[in-house]
Every structure is written in C-alpha cells, then in structure tokens.
C-alpha cells in the first residue's frame, strides 16, 4: 500500500468513526438497538430450536444476598425489578436538570408540555376503560397506554433533525419527561402490592436521610448510592415498586451547590445514560418481547374478553395519545396561555402527538407488573407492540409529508 493510499484509508476510517459518534450522540443508535433487541426476541421465541434456550435464559433462578437480606429471583425479575431502577434514575436526573438548569427553567415554557402530557394520559385511560370497564380482571391494565418511549421518539426524530427546531425538541423532551412523571406517580399510587408497614416506615426514614444530604448540599455520589441501595431494599420489602427509588434518589441530588453547578450531578447522568440506553433497555426489550407470532394475529387469545384488552391498548396508544395531546394543547395555544414551539405548524405538532403513542418500553414495563399470567401478558405485549408500531409508521408519514413542504 502506497503512502497516498494509506492516508486515504485513514481518512475514511476517521470519517466512519465520526459518523458512528454522531449516530450515537443523535439518539438514533439507542432506537436501533431497541429494534434489534425486539427482532431477536421475536426470532428466538418463535424458533423451535432456540425457544427453549430463550425461556431457560430469562427464567433462570438465582439468589442475591445483600447483608442479612436474601432475595430469590429469576433473571427477568432482576432486570424488570432491579436494573430498571437505573432507567428511572435517569428519568429523574433528566427531569430535574431540565427544570432547574435546562430549557424549562422558564416555567411558562413548561405549560404546553405539561398540558400535552396530561391529555396524553387522561384520554388513553378513558379509551382503555371504555373497552374494559366491565372486566374486573383486565381493568387494572388502564395505565398501560399512558406511556411514551422517549428513546424511540428521539431516535425517529433524529432522521428529521434539520426540520426540528430547538424549541420543538425542548417541547418533546419536556412532554416525555412529564409523561414519565405521571407514570411514576401512577405506579406508586395504584400499582403497589400489600403494604409492609414496618418496611414502609424504614423507607420513610431513608428518604428523610436523602433530604438531609440534599439540605447539607452533599455532592459526593457515594453517599447517595449507599442510601439509595438501602432505599431499594426497604421499598421492595414494603411492597412498593423498588424501581421507583431511582427517581426518588435523583430528586434529592443537588443540581447546584452554593450557586455553582454540581459537576457530580452531570457526571452521574453521563455515566447512567449509556448504561441505560445501550444495555438495560435493549436487555429489557429482549426479555419482555418474546411472544409467539400467533398473538399478533390474535389467534392465541384465551377468550373474547382478551380482545377488549388488546383493543384498549392499541386504540389507547394510537388514538388516545394523539387525541389527548391535541385536545388539551389546542385551547391553551388558542387563548394564548402558551405558544407552539418556533417553526412548528399545527400539522408538524400533530405528527409529534402521533409519535407520542409509541409506548413500547414503559408500556411493556407497566404491563409486566400488571399481568403475570401468560394469557393476558402475551396479548398485552402484542397489543403494545402493534399500537406503538402503528403510531410510529403513521407519525413518520405525517412528519415526512409536512417537512417535505418546507
């Protein structure tokens, strides 16, 4: 190889590396990983030779000992109830940063994302209840269609980055985070098992310790990690979803200390983000998306009543999300209580509302703690995937149409 060819080769390698970095930074890569994880789960769960290995992998049992506490669990439970804590930690960190230092420091700019998120919760719930109000076994799944998968939405929008203004991106992030906040509150209030009062009191004491750490403006992450681990154990023992402790910890880590930005806060967010987006979420999707293809044709449904569950989720995600976001947002903009993001038409805003119906990861998470028996669980997962897929395809089509005119 000549010197000239070597230089050209190095330039090409550097160009590829730069493109990969940009791909990872844009959020597209996280969305691609989720699609790959989902595809692999469908393939292995429907392959006669691989399905037994898949099942033995996700349901393999082992015990975890922390101090005097011994937890016996399966791998899928460890991911859903343990590792997903980091997902909620990241949500909490991003939420706090955007409120204190980010785009939504100006509270007026928070009005539109807040009302859009509220509409995106209320209407999907009403639609789900319309189909399942007379089915006591299925009505408890009402929170499944309220979620929006931020990683997927941002991944899709990265392909339209030239047409997405900074204000519109800020709206999308704000809407997604507030939507996640509603999901967290609903999980804490309505999806709690039998309460263990002594463990709940211990959790309260630990949360008070977090308050003291915040009040004293302690910035060392070590203390928050230790206290957070104790909080997770006590919350699991109390019957409350232990994963929620991630968001609680994030709320108590100070963003600013004595008027200066706390670099430890951003350091934790930077460490958590790739771990969550490139490992935990793909692993969660892989372990929770393995269902037989017959469920997508509704041939595997156990009874006609399960169809109500399926319709409630699909219509809740696809119709409920877009309808709720638009119905709640329009009056606020019309009466000048807030403004649409800059360079954003109502059609473009509508395309974002449709993409809000991509529930996927968080919808699967809520569904996994709602339905444990295989019949409703498999139908629930198929419905979440179908509803999210329809929302993604239709949202992209509308967004492509309106950006094509710009």
From Swiss-Prot:
UniProt topology in membrane: Multi-pass membrane protein
GO molecular function list: sodium:proton antiporter activity
Catalytic activity as recorded in UniProt: Na(+)(in) + 2 H(+)(out) = Na(+)(out) + 2 H(+)(in)
Record-linked InterPro entries: Na/H_antiporter_dom_sf (IPR023171), NhaA (IPR004670)
Keyword Membrane: yes
Keywords of the record: Antiport, Cell inner membrane, Cell membrane, Ion transport, Membrane, Sodium, Sodium transport, Transmembrane, Transmembrane helix, Transport
Subcellular localization: Cell inner membrane
Signal peptide residues on this chain, from the entry's feature table: none
Main localization of the protein described in the UniProt heading: membrane
PANTHER family reported in the protein's UniProt record: NA(+)_H(+) ANTIPORTER NHAA, SODIUM ION/PROTON ANTIPORTER NHAA-RELATED
UniProt similarity note: Belongs to the NhaA Na(+)/H(+) (TC 2.A.33) antiporter family.
Protein name, as recorded: Na(+)/H(+) antiporter NhaA
Gene it is expressed from: nhaA
């Amino acid at each position: 190889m000549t010197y000239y060819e070597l230089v050209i080769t190095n330039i090409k390698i550097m160009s590829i590396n730069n493109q990969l970095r940009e791909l990872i930074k844009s959020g597209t890569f996280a969305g691609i990983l989720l699609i790959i994880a989902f595809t692999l789960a469908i393939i292995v769960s429907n392959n006669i030779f691989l399905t037994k290995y898949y099942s033995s992998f996700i349901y393999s049992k082992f015990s975890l000992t922390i101090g005097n506490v011994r937890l016996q669990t399966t791998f899928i439970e460890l991911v859903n109830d343990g590792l997903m804590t980091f997902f909620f930690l990241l949500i909490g960190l991003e939420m706090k940063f955007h409120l204190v230092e980010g785009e939504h420091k100006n509270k007026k700019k928070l009005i539109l994302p807040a009302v859009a998120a509220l509409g995106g919760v209320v209407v999907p719930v009403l639609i789900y209840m319309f189909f399942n109000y007379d089915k006591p076994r299925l009505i408890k799944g009402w929170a499944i269609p309220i979620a929006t998968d931020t990683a997927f939405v941002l991944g899709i929008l990265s392909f339209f980055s030239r047409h997405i203004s900074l204000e519109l991106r800020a709206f999308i992030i704000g809407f997604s985070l507030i939507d996640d906040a509603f999901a967290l509150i609903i999980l804490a209030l309505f999806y709690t098992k039998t309460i263990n009062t002594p463990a709940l009191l211990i959790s309260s004491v630990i949360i008070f310790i977090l308050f003291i750490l915040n009040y004293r403006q302690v910035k060392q992450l070590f203390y928050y990690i230790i206290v957070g681990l104790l909080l997770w154990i006590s919350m699991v023992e109390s019957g409350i979803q232990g994963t929620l402790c991630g968001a609680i910890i994030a709320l108590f880590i100070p963003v600013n200390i004595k008027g200066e930005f706390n670099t430890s806060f951003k350091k934790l967010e930077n460490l958590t983000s790739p771990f969550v987006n490139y490992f935990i979420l793909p692993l969660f999707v892989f372990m929770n998306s393995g269902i037989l293809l017959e469920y997508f044709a509704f041939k595997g449904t156990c009874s006609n009543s399960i169809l109500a569950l399926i319709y409630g989720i699909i219509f809740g995600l696809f119709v409920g999300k877009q309808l709720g976001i638009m119905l709640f947002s329009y009056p606020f903009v019309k009466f000048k209580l807030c403004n649409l993001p800059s360079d954003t038409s109502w059609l473009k805003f509508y395309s974002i509302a449709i993409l809000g119906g991509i529930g996927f990861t968080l919808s699967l998470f809520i569904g996994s703690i709602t339905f444990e028996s295989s019949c409703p669980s498999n139908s629930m997962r198929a419905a979440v995937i179908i509803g999210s897929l329809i929302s993604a395809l239709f949202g992209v089509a509308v967004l492509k149409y309106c950006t094509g005119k710009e």
